[in-house]
Amino acid sequence: MSYTIEGATGAWELVIGLEVHAQVISQSKLFSGAATAFGAEPNSQVSLVDAALPGMLPVLNRECVAQAVRTGLGLKAHINPVSRFDRKNYFYADLPQGYQISQFAHPIVGSGTIEIELQDGSTRQIGVTRLHLEQDAGKSLHDQDPTRSFIDLNRSGVALMEIVSEPDMRSPEEAGAYLRKLRTILRYLGTCDGNMEEGSMRADVNVSVRRAGEPFRTRCEIKNVNSIRYVMQAIEAEAKRQIAIWEEGEEVDQETRLFDPSRGETRSMRSKEDAHDYRYFPDPDLLPLVLDEDWIEGLKASLPELPDEKSARFVSEYGLTRYDAGVLVAEQASAHFFETVAKGRDARLAANYITGDLFAVLNRTGRSITDSPISAEALGGLLDLLADNTINGRIAKEVFEAMAETGEHPADIVEARGLRQVTDTGAIDTAVAQVLEANPDKLAEYRSGKDKLFGFFVGQVMKAMQGKGNPALVNEALKKALG
């Protein structure tokens, strides 16, 4: 069922498009040799080109171009063999050139697509309009002094990929799923780290509302939203604001807005500019960018296995559910962890332990899987102990918790705590006899036809054996004793 927001006069449909600014992973900036490390001292990574000193000419960074092409290929997009850089003219204090070098009419990457999966298991194809390269601006700091603002140009000239979606999303959930999937693809490709908290991936959110089946209405753009959760909240808040305006018989103004997370609302920033406001024209200092087809094919051949392909392989090769496969491939590290554990073992059991028990520990301790207290080798060792009947499933859970707390190897924990599974049929027969003797009433009820009491007896025997009895042997001994 499609997502709508109920207004005073009926249901409204959302129309959402996203412009994602992804910082390119490269050692130097788009048109200069200055470094790009995050967190450096202010104005310590600024070249003469970045500072826009007179006479300084841009020199295109080949690796940034390669990263943009890799990203386009990862988005199943068309790579344009000829593209062009343009000047986008506007004044701002942290833009020393007085213009931004971008790509307007001829971007490096054309249309592509991203498949997203929603919570109900359904999938949707979201169109990608284009990807173009551009410079980032510097950073204005307004909270360092009550009467002055400061400028940090470390970010000035850093390469950005602006990835523009089609207005294909219809709910906050779809927008969140799109951003998560895009971030995963970028991380797999190694073209952007996707760290929104560091500003290396930011989203401009275009939102409008309409009645079902209507043409598009006026949209507003919410600038520089830096978390997926805030993107989803901003969409909801902005849609409700627009619905209220339309239902009062007024017109929504096309404008740029900011999202205030503390108040859960958007506020006006400026009227929305059109392309002609920026007076785009080809940058006279840069030649058109011409890409060799063989070079593009070489990049394509070097791409890693991407999330969709890896997920499909996990389903076919390991017999995982589509859901579990999707959870595991969401991060490259968790996919690698799984494959290390699953090699030569019960893959579905490995997936269950990782997506259930291990992820619960990581969430509880605020750790990532790369910093897991339980290594892939150690978890594999636990599954080996289960497979060779050294321990049973109940004991395995106890050993897992001990592994998470101490970091010890599972075999050492089992030996130190005396947790080996009891497979001695004599000991099991003795425990069964004691349980039946201690529960004559239940025994009589069972023999009179209450078969469901079998589970009670299993539980009592396992309790008597401190959970160490082999479940299959306990069942077998009970069936024999109960006749």
Curated annotation (Swiss-Prot):
The keyword ATP-binding applies. Its EC number is 6.3.5.-. It catalyses: L-glutamyl-tRNA(Gln) + L-glutamine + ATP + H2O = L-glutaminyl-tRNA(Gln) + L-glutamate + ADP + phosphate + H(+); L-aspartyl-tRNA(Asn) + L-glutamine + ATP + H2O = L-asparaginyl-tRNA(Asn) + L-glutamate + ADP + phosphate + 2 H(+). The keyword Protein biosynthesis applies. It holds the Pfam family GatB_Yqey. InterPro entries: Asn/Gln-tRNA_amidoTrfase_suB/E (IPR017959), Asn/Gln-tRNA_Trfase_suB/E_cat (IPR006075), Asn/Gln_amidotransferase (IPR018027), Asn/Gln_tRNA_amidoTrase-B-like (IPR003789), GatB (IPR004413), GatB_C_1 (IPR042114), GatB_Yqey_C_2 (IPR023168), Gln-tRNA_amidoTrfase_suB_CS (IPR017958). One of its GO terms (molecular function) is ATP binding. It comes from the Bacteria. It is an enzyme of class 6 (ligase). GO terms for biological process: glutaminyl-tRNAGln biosynthesis via transamidation; translation. Keywords: ATP-binding, Ligase, Nucleotide-binding, Protein biosynthesis. SUPFAM superfamilies: GatB/YqeY motif (SSF89095), Glutamine synthetase/guanido kinase (SSF55931). Belongs to the GatB/GatE family. GatB subfamily. Heterotrimer of A, B and C subunits. Allows the formation of correctly charged Asn-tRNA(Asn) or Gln-tRNA(Gln) through the transamidation of misacylated Asp-tRNA(Asn) or Glu-tRNA(Gln) in organisms which lack either or both of asparaginyl-tRNA or glutaminyl-tRNA synthetases. The reaction takes place in the presence of glutamine and ATP through an activated phospho-Asp-tRNA(Asn) or phospho-Glu-tRNA(Gln). This is Aspartyl/glutamyl-tRNA(Asn/Gln) amidotransferase subunit B. The gene is gatB.
